[in-house]
Amino acid sequence: MSKGHRSQDKKERNKANREKRPHAHLRHVRVSDIKARVVLREIIGKNVVEARALLLYNPRYAAHLIRKLLDSAVANAENNMGLDHATLFVQEAHATKGSSYYSRWRLRPRARGSASRIERKVSNISIFLGERQSAGAK
């Protein structure tokens, strides 16, 4: 039997299943998910300081967006969970395909005199951080 209204039950259930790791999401960003994954593969498993340095000197456009997202995830970990940024590392990072949109007036010529609209790629990027234990503690 439920304790209250179904919206209250759903709120309690969602609170129990909420993600416990520090994380940050970037939604509907105007970069291809394939190009974002190339940058994300470089930082998975690295500590936060090293990952930020890699992103700072990466010439790709997606690296700038991912660096800001990493800074947001670190700030979430420090402010919301009270973790030290020296012990944090990038545990999981992924980019998924978002809902792409079409350029309104630009067309790409196709076969037999036809044309199709140019599709603009959009992606959703997520970064999850983990906490490494210090070398002294076992």
State each model region's role.
Residues 2-94, 124-132, 136-138:
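Ribosome large-subunit tunnel/peptidyl-transferase-proximal elements
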Residues 98-138:
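Strongly charged
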